[in-house]
Regions:
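C-terminal cap of metal-dependent C-N hydrolases
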Residues: 52, 412-414, 433-474
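Divalent-metal coordination cores built from histidine and acidic residues
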Residues: 94, 98-99, 103-116, 121-233, ...
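Histidine-rich, glycine-flanked metal-binding segment
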Residues: 54, 58-100
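Histidine/acidic-residue-rich catalytic or RNA/ligand-binding cores of hydrolases
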Residues: 114-117, 241, 271-277, 312, ...
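Boundary at the C-terminal end of the N-terminal hydrophobic targeting segment
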Residues: 44-46
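N-terminal secretory signal peptides that target proteins for export/translocation
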Residues: 1-23
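His/Asp/Glu-enriched, well-ordered alpha-helical/loop segment
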Residues: 256, 343-442, 462
Length: 475
């Protein structure tokens, strides 16, 4: 359901129409300017959202709160009754609702999953935008695409988003580095190499020796990359594992250039040396018996984050097409592929009690040590691991393994924003971007209530989720 408001610009618009009808050229010009200004939010009214439960994102809650938005920014937040809307502003009574900061997916691979299939042929500007719109539909306001993007196309999409030509999650992307011609899982590797060929872009940077690795870092820094993603994984013996001398050279050069380095590592046992080398974070937690208290303490002392990334394994065998929450964005063709019986998926997937216990113990070690656990999904790295939806499922896994709902929400908001250096996202505080989600139910009571999305706002503007849903289901 969309919030209904009475827009006070209506009276002003009517007056303009009355006085300018006989001056058609001037009328057309002013109308174009008027709607441009409206589109850019320059004529937006202040909005007061009041009587809501406000989950700030830093672990605190305002049970009966209010938030004032002016243009693209949050300008005040506090107890209901203490804030009032500016003159000519609009007030929304959100009694019984919950406000949360917009969510962030800190590990994905956009562009390859399309409306009716997965692969390199989908990697177009239009599909990148579609993926970012799907993230926004599910309440995600930013996504980090980890080392599989053609930078030219990514920059074009970023520019269009900055110009507000569409509403979608913010896009961050990285230069991917690994031994030559290697890195992603073998299925995904073929698709990334195909995109390299079709676009002429350098997506996967092959590392051969330390000096060449340092030169590669200098080159990506000159191209204004902010992140590097390293693969340190032999893929079960099918690829060459990146040598310590190479990842040490990359991390050292990246730190000198002001770039952040995130790691796909094969085992938890790889983590100590990578932490010592200066890695900023791990895109796979390798949660289990090998990720013990000693590694957790080293992570904490070095302020290195961990993305558990557990849904990638759990959901690939589940009949997710039967989940109505995902069905909202699926084409009829794709829905039929994902229903019970298709691809040998099951409605209920049994989990190993031993593995579950090991993961719970590993999670507890990370939490007790104060490690920043961050939400990431690896969405898009394999077929039908869907954007946005998988983030909500990952939150459910976090809570199942021992996090509180509040801790899980912080992993998807303030902690993700901090490690991605998104200084205006992740919190509902004055001065931050007005990127937030209105929920019909309280996620602190049940984390699955993050699914109860009433509205999503990006830069102070509501996302038209109904139009997006109709568009996607019709494909």
């Amino acid at each position: 359901m969309r919030l209904r408001i009475t827009n006070s610009v209506t009276h002003l618009t009517s007056s303009l129409l009355f006085h300018l009808q006989k001056r058609r050229k001037l009328f057309s010009t002013l109308c174009a300017l008027w709607f441009c200004l409206l589109g850019q939010g320059l004529l937006a009214q202040p909005m007061l959202f009041t009587n809501a439960r406000i989950i700030v994102g830093d672990g605190s809650v305002i049970e009966q709160g209010a938030m004032l938005v002016d243009g693209e920014s949050i300008v005040a937040i506090g107890d209901a009754g203490e804030l009032s809307s500016a003159e000519n502003g609009t007030t929304f009574d959100l009694s019984g609702k919950t406000l949360i900061p917009g969510l962030i997916d800190a590990h994905a691979h956009i562009g390859y999953q399309g409306r009716n299939g997965w692969g390199a042929e989908n990697y177009t500007q239009e599909n990148l935008i579609d993926n970012l719109q799907q993230y926004a539909y599910y309440g995600f306001v930013a996504v980090f695409s980890a080392g599989s993007d053609a930078p030219g196309l990514a920059i074009e999409v970023q520019s269009r988003l900055a110009l507000q030509q569409f509403q979608g999650a913010r896009l961050l992307y990285a230069a991917g580095m690994a031994p030559p011609g290697q890195g992603p899982n073998n299925q995904f590797l073929d698709q990334a190499l195909a995109v390299e060929k079709s676009t002429g872009a350098n997506i996967l940077w092959g590392l051969e020796n330390p000096e060449q690795a340092r030169a590669a870092v200098r080159e990506v820094a000159a191209q204004d990359f902010e992140f590097i993603k390293l693969w340190v994984d032999d893929r079960g013996g099918s690829q060459q594992k990146l040598a310590p001398s190479l990842y040490e050279a990359v991390i050292e050069a990246a730190r000198s250039a002001g770039l952040r380095v995130f790691i796909h590592q094969q085992f938890a046992e790889d983590m100590p040396d990578l932490i010592t080398a200066g890695a900023h974070g791990f895109l796979h937690g390798r949660i289990g018996s090998s990720l013990n208290a000693a590694i957790a303490e080293q992570l904490s002392q070095s302020n290195v984050f961990v993305i558990p990334n557990l849904g990638l394994g759990e959901l690939r065998s589940e009949a997710i097409g039967a989940d109505r929450f995902l069905g909202q964005v699926l084409s009829s063709e794709l829905r039929s592929q994902l229903l019970l019986g298709a691809n040998r998926r099951e409605l209920s997937v049994s989990r190993s009690p031993q593995l579950e216990a090991e993961q719970r113990e590993s999670f507890a070690a990370l939490i007790d040590a104060g490690v920043d656990i961050v939400l990431g999904t690896d969405a898009g790295a394999i077929p039908n691991h869907h954007f946005g939806y998988t983030g909500h499922r990952e939150l459910e896994i976090f809570v199942r393994l021992g996090m509180s709902p509040m801790q899980a929400l912080q992993a998807a908001t303030s902690k993700a924003a901090n490690h991605l250096q998104l200084d205006d996202l992740g919190l509902l505080q004055s001065g931050y971007s007005a990127d937030f989600v209105i929920l019909d139910a309280n996620p602190l009571e049940d984390i699955r209530n993050t699914r109860s999305i009433m509205d999503v706002y990006l830069k102070g503007k509501p996302v038209d989720r109904a139009v997006l849903q109709q568009q996607w289901q019709g494909q």
